[in-house]
UniProtKB/Swiss-Prot annotation:
HAMAP family cross-referenced by the UniProt entry: Ferrochelatase
Origin species: Synechococcus sp. (strain JA-3-3Ab)
GO CC list: cytoplasm
Annotated catalysed reactions: heme b + 2 H(+) = protoporphyrin IX + Fe(2+)
SS bond partners: none
Protein name: Ferrochelatase
Amino acid sequence: MSKSGVLLLNLGGPETQADVQPFLYNLFADPELIRLPFPFLQRAFAWAISTLRAPKSRRNYAAIGGGSPLRRITAAQAQALQAQLVAAGYDVPVYVAMRYWHPLIESVVQQIKSDGITRLVVLPLYPQYSISTTGSSFKLLDRLWAEDPELARIERRQICSWYDQPQYVQAMARAIREQLDAFEDPAGVHVLFSAHGIPESYVTQAGDPYQQEMEACVQLIWREVGRPNRHTLSYQSRVGSVRWLQPYTETVIPELGACGVRQLLVVPISFVSEHIETLQEIDIEYRELAHQAGIREFRRVPALNADPLFIAGLVALVRPHLLTSAPAFVPAAVGGSLLER
């Protein structure tokens, strides 16, 4: 007898100050995130960089309450998704797994196996595909399935990217309009879409579709917003000295201030949950940067979290794969599309 389940994937985040260094180690030990010319150096590099960055990172997490809310918010998203699936006639469990912190993918997959799941729909909570996010998690799942004959009997249906999902686009557009209307002069607001950056070489050399999907996503959302405001796309959270996708958010904000922008709305376009990049990097660092640049009114669009319209979009993504007659899918080599298995 078949038994379906849904697995939500996310990055993970440290929940206490003690978690910060081991979380960073897991992050930098992933060769899909940080690519070194000599793979045997990966673990040593991860230990060194996590040790060096931990003090500053702890201060950043302390500024937002001591730890990341990502696990709690993702659990709320899973509960909301399960409730909407049940209402639609699909009584299936929804699991949450994180790539770099607990609950780790490896342990959650064992729970899925113990629960007797025979068909698993895998939904990364990254709207746009990247080698470094969805791709990394899918590679880990591929390895786990290859190593365990019992897992190999579980049919996996993986959703690569969903930046163009209609309800997601509508939910983002609605949130933007609500924040625009809160400004003193809504028509005079400049809208800055700030996406998480990736190394430029991922796009130019490895064929990562992230930038293309991000630009298409912004166009879809802006069309749905239906306002004449000027808008810009930039990239944040750069690590290291290599060239990442540009323009950088920390460069764009002072440039906008120098051009006379006095009202700025930041849209965290690649984040569907509040975490360190929204609560600390945007709300604290970029807000201060904006004020220094002469921007007198600064707002941010909240992450969608468990917004019912957004969750309805996740239901629409998952539901076709719960049907017994639907074909199973696996990600293409690069991503962004689906191949029938």
